[in-house]
């Protein structure tokens, strides 16, 4: 622990805490990173005390540098941490880990005069030459030299096959990774694929067919003189009967070069395209947009299936212009047809943005509910016949008595007299049965309406009118008796005190005739 605590002190420790782990990042170095680096040095047989000086850090870098290209992430992190500590001991101003690594590289190059001590990340992949050369065949010292594929390239190819499972992305991925490769390198890539042996067998069959067709189209010219390079056969292009040196000579000879690497790549691309169709049996005609699927997701699926189709570009263009709109859902199709003839993809994506999503469904639902819940439109004739509200309190139209702002009207609203309400108003007309609880006039007999100012001279034609008037007067008297019972009781008591008999009206003839109307029921 003593060595760990004495590695950086004072200003050096403060300087360490100002250096960022990554360019533009928020995290910075702490003392715990030095403790971690000291623990990792024990695994490589290096003493912790080497971190206390600039020379000791340089010895650590000399040991770790050759292992960085193929080392683990912990080894690379240890190398980066030691570079930062070396810069602090050397009083070099750095802001982050990348700056410290660059300073260390320049120092190592200046001391040794070569780039042997530099990490592999800074080494060029191929030396410069007049003609140049694609990786892995490089032109060094006037000769073409073959460099095998790196494990990183092979690992990238295997991951591509395992993750995409021979999707449409495998073909362009193979083209990028096999650029400039010889048939020997391409066979290495194919041999690294462990799974999907059915697809590998399909590719082998395609290679055999293309090799046989090559032999038919390129027959052997005849016996060759000694020392002359022979012409490649189909098996030579496939890398089964040729060496790497012969393949390089065919590719880069000055007269009539044969790009065996590119030819072999085309054969494999044909096989990969068949594998893509086998592993992706969905036809582009079956790609249709779902009722709730966003238009952008539908376009992604459409173009992914179109990418797997091995057809003429003109046919693909027709599919894009016709099927993309034809297989859209009704909502998006209605929007796309409004864009006119041959709209661009950008216009279609912009116009259909949000169509079919939750926002658009919510708007449609809100509009539907608004139509259902909202009041039904009133016909013009019915609106003209509708009468306006009339207030019983102030007599004005346009509002009801409950909404009236005028002072509350006292007394009966019909006759204006106090002491009763409109329901019990004596001025209300009633039939021979009196005022019923229904609040309307009885319909037993028609009531003759006599105009004001006119008195009929002749007796009524119908005798029932005279009888109805008598019933109305009798009903009026009965209402008055019901409304003032206390007054009648007091009058009876006064008559008894005076020794008189209380006056009672005898039953009228009209009420006696009422019994005859109903027979024996009364």
Swiss-Prot record:
Q: Any idea what this protein is called? A: Gag polyprotein
What ranges does the record give for the region Interaction with Gp41, renumbered to this chain? 7-31
Q: What taxonomic ancestry is recorded?
A: Viruses, Riboviria, Pararnavirae, Artverviricota, Revtraviricetes
- Look up the record and report any one GO term of the cellular component aspect: membrane
Q: Does the keyword Membrane apply?
A: yes
Supply the InterPro entries for this chain: Gag_p24_C, Lentvrl_matrix_N, Matrix_HIV/RSV_N, Primate_lentivir_Gag_pol-like, Retrov_capsid_C, Retrov_capsid_N, Retrovr_matrix, Znf_CCHC
- Regions of compositional bias (Polar residues) in chain numbering: 119-128
Q: Where is this region: PPIA/CYPA-binding loop?
A: 219-226
Q: Which PANTHER family match?
A: ENDOGENOUS RETROVIRUS GROUP K MEMBER 24 GAG POLYPROTEIN-RELATED
Q: Where are the zinc fingers (CCHC-type)?
A: 389-406, 410-427
């Amino acid at each position: 622990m003593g060595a760990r605590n004495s590695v950086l002190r004072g200003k050096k420790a403060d300087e360490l805490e100002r250096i960022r782990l990554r360019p533009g990042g928020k995290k910075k170095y702490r003392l715990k990173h030095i403790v971690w680096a000291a623990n990792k040095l024990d695994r490589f047989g290096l003493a912790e005390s080497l971190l206390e000086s600039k020379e000791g850090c340089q010895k650590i870098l000399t040991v770790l540098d050759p292992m960085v290209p193929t080392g683990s992430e912990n080894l690379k992190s240890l190398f980066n941490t030691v570079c930062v500590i070396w810069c602090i001991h050397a009083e070099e101003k750095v802001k982050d880990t990348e700056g410290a690594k660059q300073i260390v590289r320049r120092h190592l190059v200046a001391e040794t005069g070569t780039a042997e001590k530099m990490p592999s990340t800074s080494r060029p992949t191929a030396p410069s030459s007049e003609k140049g050369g694609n990786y892995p065949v490089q032109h060094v010292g006037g000769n073409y030299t073959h460099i095998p594929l790196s494990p990183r390239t092979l690992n990238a190819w295997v991951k591509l096959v395992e993750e995409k499972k021979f999707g449409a992305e495998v073909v362009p991925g193979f083209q990028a990774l096999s650029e400039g490769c010889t048939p020997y390198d391409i066979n290495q890539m194919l041999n690294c694929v462990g799974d999907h042996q059915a697809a590998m067998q399909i590719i082998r069959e395609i290679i055999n067919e293309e090799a046989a067709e090559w032999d038919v189209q390129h027959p052997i010219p005849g016996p060759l003189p000694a020392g002359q390079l022979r012409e490649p056969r189909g098996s030579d292009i496939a890398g089964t009967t040729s060496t790497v040196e012969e393949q390089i000579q065919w590719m880069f000879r000055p007269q009539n070069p044969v790009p065996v690497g590119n030819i072999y790549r085309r054969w494999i691309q044909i096989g990969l395209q068949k594998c893509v169709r086998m592993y992706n049996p969905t036809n582009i005609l079956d790609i249709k947009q779902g009722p709730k699927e966003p238009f952008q997701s539908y376009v992604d699926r459409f173009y992914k299936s179109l990418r797997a189709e091995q057809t003429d570009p003109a046919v693909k263009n027709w599919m894009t212009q016709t099927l993309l709109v034809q297989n859209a859902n009704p909502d998006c199709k209605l929007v796309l047809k409004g864009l006119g003839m041959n709209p661009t993809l950008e216009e279609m994506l912009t116009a259909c943005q949000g169509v079919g999503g939750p926002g658009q469904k919510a708007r449609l639902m809100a509009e539907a509910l608004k139509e259902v819940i909202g009041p039904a439109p009133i016909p013009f004739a019915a609106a003209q016949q509708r009468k306006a509200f009339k207030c019983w309190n102030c007599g004005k139209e346009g509002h009801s008595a409950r909404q009236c702002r005028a002072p509350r009207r006292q007394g009966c609203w019909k006759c204006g007299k106090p002491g009763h309400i409109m329901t019990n108003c004596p001025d209300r007309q009633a039939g021979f049965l009196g005022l019923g609880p229904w609040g309307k006039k009885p319909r037993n007999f028609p009531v003759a309406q006599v105009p004001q100012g006119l008195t009929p001279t002749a007796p009524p034609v119908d005798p029932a009118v005279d009888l109805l008037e008598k019933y109305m007067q009798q009903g009026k008297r009965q209402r008055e008796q019901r409304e003032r019972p206390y007054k009648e009781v007091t009058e009876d008591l006064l008559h008894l005190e005076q020794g008189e008999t209380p006056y009672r009206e005898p039953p009228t003839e009209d009420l006696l005739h009422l019994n005859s109307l109903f027979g024996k029921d009364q």
